[in-house]
């Protein structure tokens, strides 16, 4: 066994006769290729999970900002609703006063004329 290669119990030891079993070498090379492919896929998955975490943090921040904006919008909408209610009330009071004044202007001369 060569001292430059670390011991791996799953890899059979290399025989001194390199051409003795080419089938075994092909299988070993294929297994190593599959392992390398799997390691690459796992690294990609880990990177994607990290990116997903960053995006989730960004989305969470945006959701918080949206909730704050929604509260401000709700307060503004309530303020406008109250302002419009007061404006409508003032308009109704003005119309009521105009109707009362018109009735007084019409009824008082009639009552004075017939009395």
From Swiss-Prot:
Instruction: State the organism named in the record.
Output: Saccharomyces cerevisiae (strain ATCC 204508 / S288c)
The organism's superkingdom is given as Eukaryota
Q: Which family does it belong to?
A: Belongs to the synaptobrevin family.
Gene Ontology biological process terms from the UniProt entry: ascospore-type prospore assembly; endocytosis; exocytosis; Golgi to endosome transport; Golgi to plasma membrane transport; Golgi vesicle fusion to target membrane; intracellular protein transport; retrograde transport, endosome to Golgi
Lineage, highest ranks first: Eukaryota, Fungi, Dikarya, Ascomycota, Saccharomycotina
Topological domain ranges for the Vesicular compartment: 113-115
* Biased composition annotated in UniProt, kind: Low complexity: 1-16
Instruction: Reply yes or no: does the keyword Membrane apply.
Output: yes
What GO molecular function terms would the record report?
molecular adaptor activity; SNAP receptor activity; syntaxin binding
Task: Supply the CDD domains for this chain.
Answer: R-SNARE_Snc1
v-SNARE coiled-coil homology domain location: 27-87
Q: InterPro entries this protein is in?
A: Synaptobrevin-like (IPR001388), Synaptobrevin/VAMP (IPR016444), V_SNARE_CC (IPR042855)
Task: Give the region (Disordered) as residue ranges.
Answer: 1-28
Q: Which residue ranges does UniProt annotate as crossing the membrane?
A: 94-112
Q: Which residues carry this modification: Phosphoserine?
A: 58
Entry comment on modification after translation: Palmitoylated by SWF1.
This protein is called what?
Synaptobrevin homolog 2
Position(s), cross-link Glycyl lysine isopeptide (Lys-Gly) (interchain with G-Cter in ubiquitin): 62
Which cell locations does it reside in?
A: Endomembrane system
UniProt KW keywords: Coiled coil, Isopeptide bond, Lipoprotein, Membrane, Palmitate, Phosphoprotein, Transmembrane, Transmembrane helix, Ubl conjugation
């Amino acid at each position: 066994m060569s001292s430059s290669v670390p011991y791996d119990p799953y890899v059979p030891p290399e025989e001194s006769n390199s051409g003795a079993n080419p089938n075994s070498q092909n299988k070993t090379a294929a297994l190593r290729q599959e392992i390398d492919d799997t390691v690459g896929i796992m690294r990609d998955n880990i990177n994607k999970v990290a990116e997903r975490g960053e995006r989730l943090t960004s989305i969470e921040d945006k959701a918080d900002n949206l909730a704050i904006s929604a509260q401000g919008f709700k307060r503004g909408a309530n303020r406008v609703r109250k302002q419009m209610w007061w404006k409508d009330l003032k308009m109704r009071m003005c119309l009521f006063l105009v109707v009362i004044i018109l009735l007084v202007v019409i009824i008082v001369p009639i009552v004075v004329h017939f009395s």
